[in-house]
């Protein structure tokens, strides 16, 4: 994981800060939008370099899942100067569906890390929920429908439970990426001197999942820890092996 992070930093440095990098191509009033999931400090560090070129920095991570990214049905969080946000809003409403201005530079990256952390918690909880459902001899198709219309529902259940029940686990997002995101959240909490209870355990669980199934295993395979521990599986008929976004296309808008 450390080596991978070092490689990512080298790529980022070359793209942004090399002689022929992005920074040297910026000039007055140009807008730089960082759309990856990264930490607030790094966004602000690069943002200061952008400002030194008299350009305007924004951070704009996206959320909604890979299947929605393929159709543009995603949320975009944007932090930074409001005027710059308004200038690029028409382009953002083509790229995504729901666009939110989150505040100052870096705020969008913080919010994205929070939402990814919540998704990871929901996924781990689903593994335990499906374990109890299976060992209670519930019909897993009916259990899926019941959870989906209940107070226990979540976006993660509506999407990832489908490929879990199918057995493909194919969510197009891998174990190492979840570890990166949960690590960003956990490190942010430490930087803020905010003691947490669940976050360190989530990091530990995904490290174990990476060790068992590999860095490039689908992140949904984290529930397989429960399947293996209990010597069961969560298979059910009628679920897809990969998610497809079937929502009707519509123009994006600010929320």
Placement of each model-derived feature along the sequence:
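NAD(P)-dependent dehydrogenase/reductase Rossmann-like domain
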Residues: 211-255
